[in-house]
A protein has these predicted regions:
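Acidic, metal/ion-coordinating pockets
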Residues: 15, 19-380
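Sec-dependent N-terminal signal peptides of Gram-positive bacterial secreted proteins and lipoproteins
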Residues: 1-20
């Protein structure tokens, strides 16, 4: 309150360089209404930060074999062109598609994945704060794979959501704090590729069940200023979401999610700014596609970083997403060698045919549902 009053006093007009006497000063002060102070708080006491999210970190065997060195696996040198755009963010969310169990659990690619421990170094290098581990590959190494992944992420100081090591872990709320603003995260997957959840271990992975999701949201919503929900579902390689998935995303939006992030199709699907019945807005990214993988079709090499400007007014407690930008990315490779993650805007330098046309197609596609999404070559 001291800072607020000082601001109000300094803002009072004393006129033509005259020194106001105590009476004038006192009279002016009493005329400052509660509404004025309220407006000052909302205008000048606001927290703003950047939040960014990506699609799938999908570590195929071709990818880890390509980066293998005498001392381990050097993923980091292959992402230097894009990593700085995440490192500059205040909060970063990524989708960790594969278990990180290391060589003790036998490394493997498709269809049952297990990545080297150095995949966690990659996430750390991206400056990931929290990753979703709710996907169809969560149980590729069963209980031990979930536990190993959680352990290595904990060692790196990276939070995880959507998979859990115990019933107590499943009850733990994933809340990240940025400058005093509380951001809650939930994550779910449609299934685990037919691998059954071990008996008595339902906590291992969060499966999509709308009643459960809405209940979880209700439990978390009042404890946070912003709520992000990640949904691992959809149809692989389809460029647009199906009606049933749109309906679920919109139901989650109406239940109070500020941002809904989609994963699993491995290709980009449009972003929408959904207008809720309460007058607010929810940003829905139906599929953020692959971010770093070894898939070879052009559409599966395209991904991106979605960036949000988040504003929180301390006076009212209102938190809003004011700006949404998308920077397209591209995974260059020479078939299954020399993988490198780059901005799509630079792909012509790496030999991508009709790179400008591809960039324009991605821009048009991502803006199919709303032109409020800004497409940028590089994040500033």
């Amino acid at each position: 309150m001291m800072k607020i009053m000082m601001f109000v006093l300094l803002s009072l007009p004393f006129g033509n360089n005259e020194v106001a006497d105590y009476e004038t000063y006192d009279k002016e002060l009493t005329q400052v209404s509660g509404e004025t102070i309220h407006n000052v708080i909302n205008t000048h006491f606001q927290t703003s930060f950047s939040f960014a999210a990506t699609g799938d970190v999908l570590i195929h065997d071709h990818l880890y074999e390509d980066v293998e060195t005498e001392s381990g696996y050097d993923f980091i040198s292959r992402v230097d062109e894009v990593a700085p755009y995440l490192q500059k963010q205040d909060l970063v969310f990524m989708n960790q598609e594969t278990p990180i169990g290391g060589e003790d659990l036998r490394l493997s690619g498709y269809p049952m994945f297990n990545a080297p421990l150095e995949a966690a170094d990659l996430l750390e290098y991206f400056d990931a704060d929290i990753v979703s581990f709710a996907n169809n590959h969560t149980l590729d190494r069963s209980t031990e794979g979930v536990e190993r992944t959680a352990d290595i992420l904990n060692e790196k100081g990276i939070e995880y959501v959507g998979a859990n090591t115990s019933p107590e872990d499943a009850e733990r709320k994933r809340i990240m704090e940025v400058d005093g603003v509380e951001v809650g995260f939930l994550a779910y997957t449609y299934g685990t590729n037919g691998i059954p959840v071990p008996e008595g271990e339902d906590h291992l992975v969060n499966l999509i069940d709308m009643e459960t999701i809405l209940s979880d949201m209700e439990d978390l919503r009042d404890e946070v200023d912003m709520l992000v929900v990640s949904m691992h579902q959809g149809v692989e390689y389809e460029p647009y979401p199906r009606d049933e998935h749109v309906a679920q995303f919109e139901q989650i939006a109406e239940a109070g999610a500020d941002i809904v992030l989609g994963h699993h199709p491995h290709v980009l699907q449009p972003v929408d700014i959904y207008e809720r019945e309460d007058g607010g807005e929810t940003v829905i990214a139906y599929s953020l596609a692959n971010f770093f993988s070894a898939q070879q079709d052009l559409d599966t090499k395209l991904g991106g970083i979605i960036e949000f400007d988040v504003n929180h007014k301390q006076g009212t407690g209102d938190t809003t997403v004011e700006g949404v930008r998308f920077m397209p990315t591209y995974v260059h490779s020479e078939e299954y060698d020399n993988f490198e993650l780059i901005p799509l805007a630079d792909a012509d330098e790496y030999g991508l045919e009709d790179a400008d046309g591809v960039y324009q197609d991605v821009s048009d596609h991502m803006q199919s549902y709303t032109e409020e999404l800004e497409i940028v070559e590089y994040l500033e």
